[in-house]
From Swiss-Prot:
EC number: 2.3.3.13
Subunit note: Homodimer.
Organism: Shewanella sp. (strain MR-4)
Protein name as catalogued: 2-isopropylmalate synthase
Gene Ontology molecular functions: 2-isopropylmalate synthase activity; acetyl-CoA C-acetyltransferase activity; manganese ion binding
Superkingdom of the source species: Bacteria
Region (Regulatory domain): 392-522
Lineage: Bacteria, Pseudomonadati, Pseudomonadota, Gammaproteobacteria, Alteromonadales
Coiled coil regions, renumbered to chain: none
Leader sequence residues: none
Keyword Amino-acid biosynthesis: yes
Family: Belongs to the alpha-IPM synthase/homocitrate synthase family. LeuA type 1 subfamily.
Involved pathway(s): Amino-acid biosynthesis; L-leucine biosynthesis; L-leucine from 3-methyl-2-oxobutanoate: step 1/4
């Protein structure tokens, strides 16, 4: 049996299902390119039949990615497989991933079919997918709750039909490691053609067992792990890619397997996914959390000074996190900024150097010293602003009356190329800014959640505002970054405004599509 574990990343498919707002095609491509640099073997990038937008993003990524195999999901239906094959046809190497439910509760309650009918559908889907590619993966949805006899029959039939990879998902995160390991071992013991396919696992974290179950599966013969960056995904999330990669690397002496992951790209990729997906990383998150390599105890600090491995089983440098920061001030030249971005693993195609340097000088004049996290925030904020936004905040001026508690805000906003200036009052500066923006955009939304955080520490921190707003009975999540909390709040609101504008365009597209179908008699 091979000692190489295939890393199958599904951040852009399963991971995206957890997001408050869908990623744009440009954002998905940026993440896909980061995953390629990270060294994932396979990246599942969407469900093409689900929407024109998903089809476009899968096709765009398939056309761009060269070093990783691009995969798309499909149900065990010919129309799904056709859409996946069409979207992937431009790729240098691709995989079609088809699935069907196999547990009794899913077969009877969701599919309302017999197991024999489901078995026939699975075989038909695999055979049909093989018309387009030799690389077909088949998943037994809810395998963790599937009767073992049925699971063995399904796996054997799918392999016989031509599936090269068989995925065993713990779809609802129900199993514990000893149980899940037993399922994998039973498949190896009882399925006669098991050696003709790679066994994969896809574990969810509903009971916090996803990583442990995946590692146990590897110990019992699985050689592909499906995972996401930062563990994002449906409900409680998926198996965390960075945790799996570092467990297999750090405990190679015990587990005896390896991956092709370039661990030095982990920190950079984690931050990119967090920023673009608007999902902050908890401080105590293993591997990539802010406290993962922080030592507060005096005893621990003393031990670290004497020998680093007294309290660290891996180094921050191993995941691409540099311990030493270069002091950057307004006197730093453009080459210093470029050098620091390169040291953090970014290439010039990831950001606009001219725009970043201009923003850097502005921030350095305000803060004095600028840190690595400031540069990353500025780079992503610039990328966000350039994303074909209909609304762009150009200026914000706020005046507050401390005695009356009333504030006045004046905003200048580019609204689709037309500059509008509006003023409004409110109960505090943030409320006033929001009222002025609403007046300038003539777009009404209801804010249901407002969270204020910080990028960095102490007085040098950047303010980060995360808001959730309701528009046409749908929730939208926006984020804003600035040295000033009011400006960060305004940027978060404008971010949401642009998301709702994009949603309106999608709604119009869907309406026209339905009209065309009705006219065509489809």
């Amino acid at each position: 049996m091979s000692n190489r574990v295939i890393i199958f990343d599904t951040t852009l498919r399963d991971g995206e299902q957890a997001l408050a707002a869908s990623l744009s095609v440009k954002e998905k491509l940026q993440i896909a390119m980061a995953l390629e640099r990270l060294g994932v073997d396979v990246m599942e990038v969407g469900f093409p039949v689900s929407s024109p937008g998903d089809f476009e993003s899968v096709q765009t990524i398939a056309r761009t990615i060269k070093n990783s195999r691009v995969c798309a999901l499909s149900r065990a239906l010919e129309k799904d497989i056709d859409a996946a094959a069409q979207a992937l046809s431009v790729a240098e190497q691709f995989r079609i991933h088809t699935f069907i439910s196999t547990s009794t509760i899913h077969v009877e309650s969701k599919l309302k079919r017999s197991f024999e009918q489901v078995l026939e559908m699975a075989v038909g889907a695999v055979k049909y997918a093989r018309r387009f590619t030799d690389d077909v993966e088949f998943s037994c949805e809810d395998a963790g709750r599937t009767p073992i006899d049925n699971l063995c029959r399904m796996v054997e039939a799918a392999i016989h039909a031509g599936a090269r990879t068989i995925n065993i998902p713990d779809t609802v995160g129900y199993t514990v490691p000893s149980e899940f390991g037993g399922i994998i071992q039973t498949l190896f013991n009882r399925v006669p053609n098991i050696d003709q396919a790679i066994i994969s696992v896809h574990c969810h974290d509903d009971l916090g067992m996803s990583v442990a179950n995946s590692i146990t599966a590897v110990q019992h013969g699985a050689r592909q792990i499906e995972c996401t960056m930062n563990g994002i995904g449906e409900r409680a999330g998926n198996c965390s890619l960075e945790e799996i990669a570092m467990i297999l690397a750090t405990r190679k002496n015990l587990l005896g397997v390896e991956t092709g992951i370039n661990a030095k790209e982990i920190h950079r990729t984690s931050n990119l996914v967090s920023q673009l997906c608007n999902m902050p990383i908890q401080s105590n998150k293993a591997i990539v959390g802010a406290n993962a390599f922080t030592h507060s105890s005096g005893i621990h600090q003393d031990g670290m000074l004497k020998a680093q491995n007294t309290y660290e089983i891996m180094t921050p440098e191993s995941i691409g996190l540099n311990r030493n920061n270069l002091n950057m001030t307004s006197r730093s030249g453009r080459h210093v900024i470029k050098h620091r971005m390169e040291e953090m693993g970014y290439s010039e195609q990831d950001y606009n150097l001219d725009a970043l340097y201009e923003q850097f000088l502005h921030l350095a004049d305000k803060k004095g010293q600028v840190f690595d996290y400031d540069l990353e925030a500025l780079a992503f904020m610039e990328a966000q602003a350039a994303e074909d936004n209909f609304y762009q905040l150009q200026q914000l001026v706020v005046q507050s009356d401390s005695t009356e508690g009333v504030a006045t805000a004046t905003v200048r906003i580019d609204v689709g190329g037309e500059i509008k200036t509006e003023a409004a009052t409110g109960n505090g500066p943030v409320d006033a800014a929001y009222n002025a923006i609403a007046r300038a955009t003539d777009r009404r939304i209801d804010i249901i959640s407002y969270k204020l955080g910080a990028k960095g520490e102490g007085q040098n921190a950047l303010g980060q505002v995360d808001i959730t707003a309701v528009y046409h009975e749908q929730n939208f999540h926006g984020v804003g970054l600035a040295t000033d909390v009011v400006e960060a709040s305004a940027r978060a609101l404008v971010h949401v405004m642009n998301l709702t504008c994009r949603a309106d365009k999608v709604a119009d597209y869907k309406q026209n599509m339905h009209k065309n179908r009705e006219l065509g008699g489809v």
